[in-house]
Amino acid sequence: MKKKVLAIALVTVFTGMGVAQAADVTAQAVATWSATAKKDTTSKLVVTPLGSLAFQYAEGIKGFNSQKGLFDVAIEGDSTATAFKLTSRLITNTLTQLDTSGSTLNVGVDYNGAAVEKTGDTVMIDTANGVLGGNLSPLANGYNASNRTTAQDGFTFSIISGTTNGTTAVTDYSTLPEGIWSGDVSVQFDATWTS
C-alpha cells in the first residue's frame, strides 16, 4: 500500500511541475504590400514612386515616424525649348482608420524644406529663374536634349494632424484609437517647356 501511495504522490509531483513551468508565448503580425506594375517610356513626363509609406506610432515620442519617399522623374527633351519648369502640388493626403471610428490622419509632404500644399504649386525646377532642382538637376540640364532624361529625388512625409472620429482634432496622438489607417497620398507634377 505504501508503494502505491508513494507512486501516486510522485506522479502528482511530476504533473504539478509541468504546470509550474513557463508557457511559450507567440505573437504574429502580417505585413502587406500593395502591388501593381506599369511601364511608360513614351509620355512627355513620367513620375514613379520608388517605394511605399508605412507610418508607425512610437510610444516614447507620442507620435508617428516620418518617411523619406523617393521618386523617379523622366522627361522627354524638347530641342526647341529655352526654359523648363517642374512643379508639384498635393492632391490627396488623408488616411482613414479601417474600423467604424472614422478616425483620420493627414500626411504632410515636404520637398527640400518647402511644404507641398493643395493650395499652390511648389517649384522644384525653374531654369528661367535659376532654380535647378538639386538632385533633379539632370532634368534642368537635359530638358532641351533630343532624348529622355531621368533623375531621382524624394519627399519627406510625416503625420501632421489627426482626428479621433473624422471631426474632433487631436493634439496628442496618444489619444487616437488603436488600429490601422489606410489611404493614398497623391502629388501632381506639372512640367512646362518654354520655347
UniProtKB/Swiss-Prot annotation:
Record's note on what induces expression: Negatively regulated by H-NS. Positively regulated by IHF and EcpR.
Keyword Signal in record: yes
Cellular component, GO, one term: pilus
Subcellular location: Fimbrium
Major localization class: other
Pfam family, one: MatB
Cleaved signal peptide residues: 1-22
Subunit structure: Self-associates. Forms filaments. Interacts with EcpD.
Lineage top rank: taxon: Bacteria
Record keywords: Fimbrium, Signal
Function noted in UniProt: Part of the ecpRABCDE operon, which encodes the E.coli common pilus (ECP). ECP is found in both commensal and pathogenic strains and plays a dual role in early-stage biofilm development and host cell recognition. Major subunit of the fimbria.
Gene that encodes it: ecpA
Family assignment from sequence similarity: Belongs to the EcpA/MatB fimbrillin family.
The protein's name: Common pilus major fimbrillin subunit EcpA
Further remark: Not expressed under classical laboratory conditions, but is functional when constitutively expressed.
Organism: Escherichia coli (strain K12)
